[in-house]
Design a protein with these regions (language model features):
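Loop/turn elements at helix/coil->beta-strand transitions in domains of secreted/extracellular proteins
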Residues: 8-11, 178-180
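Conserved SGNH/GDSL esterase-like catalytic core that processes O-acyl groups on lipids
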Residues: 21-126, 130-188
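A short acidic-Thr-Gly-centered motif at the start of a beta-strand
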Residues: 1-8
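Short hydrophobic beta-strand that contains or immediately precedes a catalytic carboxylate
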Residues: 12-16, 184
């Protein structure tokens, strides 16, 4: 990567407590690693606003009703990070990167069905009015679904829950280019 001869993406994940979850120390490390090896994107984000978790790279605005689950309270079926958010129909998260994105991007969400009825999916809306569907999960295991878009489209977007929404476990934004992502997971 350092010689710019590789097409690989390296994902680095820093695990820690709420200080890590605040993304202060990790952001300085991320900047150095991406400057040296290339920027492969924002990487892993918590499933919306979670107490003691923050991203130095994006602003998140949540609308509607959400119920947050934390693994320390009941450690059953959690994604990496130990948090999950259950939206009511129509609830949404607006995600605005703090720095402009460039190139082709992939937005991935981790979701799971947490009831017997078939889950609805998610809609990803862009400022120009374009809406893309993300696949609904088929089981109660965590599953990923993604869409691709140009950075121009992804400099602001809204993730909206449909009818009978699945639980949200993570949002991941990757630049489809060689380099490094550095994720901070404050597991409390």
């Amino acid at each position: 990567l350092e010689r710019k001869e590789s097409s690989e993406v390296v994902h680095i994940m820093q695990l820690g407590d709420s200080h890590t979850g605040g993304d202060y120390f990790t952001q300085a490390y991320r900047e150095q690693m991406q400057k040296r090896f290339g920027n492969a994107g924002i990487g892993w984000l918590s499933p919306g606003y979670i107490k003691n978790q923050r991203s130095a790279q994006v602003l998140m605005r949540m609308n509607g009703n959400w119920k947050t689950r934390v693994s320390r309270n009941n450690p059953e079926n959690f994604p990496l990070g130990g948090f999950a958010n259950q939206p009511e129909p129509g609830a949404s998260i607006e995600i605005v990167p703090k720095q402009p994105l460039f190139g082709l991007q992939r937005v991935t969400i981790w979701t799971r069905r947490n009831h017997d009825d078939a889950s609805g999916g998610w809609k990803l809306s862009f400022p120009d009015g374009e809406v893309r569907d993300l696949l609904a999960p088929l089981t109660s295991n965590w599953q990923s679904s993604y869409v691709m878009g140009s950075a121009i489209d992804l400099n602001s977007f809204t993730l909206r829950a449909e009818n009978n929404p699945p639980e949200l476990g993570a949002i991941i934004i990757d630049t489809l280019a060689p380099g490094v992502t550095v994720d901070s997971l404050g597991i409390v």
